Design a protein with these regions (language model features):
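N-terminal basic, low-complexity leaders that serve as flexible interaction/assembly modules and, when applicable
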Residues: 1-99, 142, 150-154, 245
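Active-site loop segments of alpha/beta catalytic cores
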Residues: 1-14, 21-25, 101-105, 109-259
């Protein structure tokens, strides 16, 4: 996803003298805020995320949440953090604690990688991979169609396709980086499975919203503040082939631009 942290967004509104509206945190892991139409118009923004609840047809359901600086905000209604050992914790679709927010942190960290102790290819295949449901696809189509027919914005949807960042969450940072460097622990099979899942979801997504959107946001965290996370040679060998296939599929099967 791409955006601005909710605390920073609240400070921006204060700086601009805007006291009304709401702070809606659509990405609670990174604590990213949706941008209100008043702000979009102020900065003459001409593109909008398909899921922006301030502009689109589906406002969604929200619940109150206090940010770490005391700012009142709204979280998705499905946001159910637990307090475990002094930390806020969130479970994923498999029931494991996947995210934790320490007391002194401003966002959630990924924890408890489910494939940390991978023993065989069967561990990869038996993991509960997350595919779009028919209900999710229908809702996305409804949102994209509304924005396409009723606004002047270019419509963007986020997808990701993270071939470096995604496996890091399932294997753990240290494990996966070692796997890439050494070629161990079924790293090629894991990358292949991620690509398979991404491509399946990508095909369904484009079939549902491809005629209504103009941009699709792909992504991967490939660098630090100072350097690439992995060497260019390792990227070309392990990651780039999958990026290339995903981006090429979009280009060859839709009129959507890759961002």
């Amino acid at each position: 996803s791409t955006g601005i942290m909710a605390i920073a967004y609240a400070q921006l509104k204060k700086h601009l003298g805007i006291s009304g509206g709401e702070i809606r945190v659509y990405d609670y892991g990174q604590q990213l805020a949706e941008i209100e139409k008043e702000i979009l118009d102020l900065f003459e923004v001409d593109v909008v995320d398909m899921n922006n609840s301030f502009v689109g047809i589906e406002p969604g359901k929200w619940k109150e949440w206090i940010l770490k600086d005391g700012t009142k905000s709204l979280m998705p209604a499905a946001f159910y953090p637990e307090k475990i050992n002094g930390k806020f914790a969130i479970r994923d679709h498999t029931g494991r604690v996947a995210l934790e927010m320490p007391e002194n942190s401003l966002y959630f960290d990924s924890v408890n990688p489910p494939l940390e102790n991978i023993k065989s290819i069967n561990d990869i295949n038996s993991y509960q991979w997350n595919y779009f449901s028919d209900e999710e696809l229908r809702l996305m189509e409804k949102k994209a169609k509304y924005l396409y027919e009723n606004t002047e914005y270019a419509v963007m949807t986020g997808f990701g396709g993270n071939m470096l960042e995604g496996p890091q969450e399932l294997r753990g940072w240290m494990n996966y980086m070692s796997d890439l460097a050494l070629g161990d622990n079924y790293v090629d099979e894991l990358l292949g499975k991620f690509f398979e899942v991404y491509l399946t979801n990508l095909k369904m997504l484009l079939q549902s919203v491809g005629k209504y959107i103009q941009l699709i946001q792909m992504g991967d965290d490939m660098g630090t503040q100072a350097n690439p996370i992995i060497s260019p040679d390792l990227y070309r060998d392990k990651i780039k082939p999958y990026h290339k296939k995903l981006y090429r599929y979009i280009q060859e099967n839709s009129d959507v631009f890759v961002f």
